[in-house]
Regions:
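RNase H-like, metal-dependent nuclease domains and their acidic two-metal-ion catalytic environment used
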Residues: 2-150, 158, 180, 184-188, ...
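Binuclear metal-ion centers of metallo-dependent hydrolases, dominated by the metallo-beta-lactamase
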Residues: 154
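Surface-exposed intrinsically disordered loops and tails
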Residues: 157-174
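Amphipathic alpha-helical blocks and their helix-capping loop/short-beta junctions
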Residues: 174-180
Length: 297
C-alpha cells in the first residue's frame, strides 16, 4: 500500500501495525547490500589527506553539482567524523572521509573539500559538538552552507552568510538537526533510495557499516561496538537532496514555465495598437469611417 511504498516494509510495520522489527534485523536488506557490493563498490582512484582517509572515486567535473554532507564525532573517542561528497544530479557517491580529527580541523577540511567540488552545498549535522565544526565554516565565510528552520517547515539551500542577521531569518539555524522528529524521516529516505536502487555507492566502508546498522528495540542504530557515522551522513545527504534541492528545482522549473507562457506577439487593443489601426499610421478607423489624422496638424 501507500505507507509501504513510502516507508518500506519494515517502516510501515512499525508505523502502522506497531510491529517493531526484532532486534538484530538490519535496516537495509542484506541481500540488497550484497548486490550493491558486487555491482558498485570499487577501490578509490585516490587516497589522500593527512591520515589517508579521504577516498576519492571521481574528480570534480567542470559543470558538476555537488553536496558535501558531514557527521561530526561526539568527541568521546568512540566514533568518527565522516563525510560524503555526492553528485547531486545522479545521487552518486564520488568521495568519502572517515577518521578521527579535531572539530576545528574538520571544519577547515570540509570548507576546502566543498570549495574543491565547485563550492558544493555543505551540510553539517549540528547536534552536540557539531556546532564547533559549523562555527569554523562560518568563520571561514563559506558561502554555500546549509541552513534549515527550527520547526522544519522549510529549508533554505541558497542562504548566504551576508544575510545571516536579517530579522526574518532569526529562526534559521546552520546545519542539519537530527532530532526525534527528523531521524525517522532520514532513515526512511535511506531505505527508500536503496530499495529503488536510486543511489550509487562506491565505498566498501559504508556498505560494511550498513551491514551492522540494525533495529535495536525499535530504533535504527549501529550494532554494539560498531559505528554508523558514514550511514548517518548518507541519510542526511539523501534527505536534503530529495527534499530541499528538489523543492528548489521545482521553483526554478515553475519560473521557467511561467516565463515561457508569456507570448511576445500578442496584440493589445488601445490607442497605440490593435485592430483600430490602419496600415497607414496617419489614418484611424473611427466607427465605420476612416479618419485622416493629418487634418489635425
Amino acid at each position: 500500500d501507500e505507507q509501504t511504498r513510502i516507508l518500506g516494509v519494515k517502516g510501515a510495520s512499525q508505523e502502522c501495525d506497531c510491529d517493531f522489527v526484532g532486534s538484530g534485523d538490519t535496516v537495509i536488506d542484506p541481500i540488497l547490500l550484497t548486490w550493491y557490493k558486487d555491482t558498485y563498490v570499487m577501490d578509490p582512484v585516490e587516497k589522500r589527506g593527512f591520515d589517508g582517509n579521504l577516498w576519492r572515486w571521481e574528480y570534480p567535473a567542470a559543470n558538476g553539482s555537488y553536496m558535501v554532507v558531514a557527521d561530526v564525532a561526539r568527541g568521546d573517542g568512540s566514533d568518527y567524523s565522516a563525510c560524503h561528497v555526492i553528485e547531486v544530479t545522479n545521487a552518486t557517491q564520488v568521495a568519502e572521509y572517515k577518521g578521527k580529527v579535531d572539530t576545528k580541523d574538520f571544519g577547515n577540511f570540509l570548507v576546502n573539500l566543498s570549495t574543491e567540488y565547485n563550492d558544493a552545498l555543505l551540510v553539517v549535522e549540528n547536534s552536540n559538538i557539531g556546532w564547533a565544526c559549523i562555527q569554523q565554516c562560518i568563520d571561514r565565510d563559506y558561502k554555500n552552507l546549509f541552513y534549515m528552520s527550527k520547526d522544519l517547515k522549510y529549508v533554505d539551500v541558497e542562504h548566504q552568510m551576508k544575510n545571516k542577521y536579517r530579522a526574518d531569518e532569526k529562526q534559521m539555524v546552520a546545519g542539519f538537526s537530527t532530532t526525534s522528529k527528523t531521524r525517522p524521516l532520514i532513515i526512511s529516505k535511506l531505505d527508500e533510495y536503496f530499495r529503488e536502487k536510486a543511489v550509487t555507492i562506491r565505498s566498501n566502508r559504508l556498505i560494511d557499516e550498513l551491514f551492522t546498522f540494525i533495529f535495536m528495540n525499535g530504533r535504527a542504530e549501529a550494532m554494539k561496538s560498531y559505528n554508523d557515522d558514514l550511514v548517518m551522513a548518507l541519510c542526511i545527504g539523501l534527505w536534503v537532496r530529495d527534499t530541499a534541492l528538489r523543492l528548489r528545482q521545482e521553483g526554478i522549473d515553475l519560473t521557467k514555465r511561467t516565463l515561457g507562457g508569456i507570448s511576445s506577439n500578442q496584440q493589445y487593443e488601445g490607442v497605440y495598437g490593435g485592430s483600430n489601426m490602419d496600415d497607414n499610421p496617419w489614418k484611424m478607423k473611427i466607427g465605420d469611417d476612416i479618419e485622416d489624422l493629418t487634418q489635425w496638424l
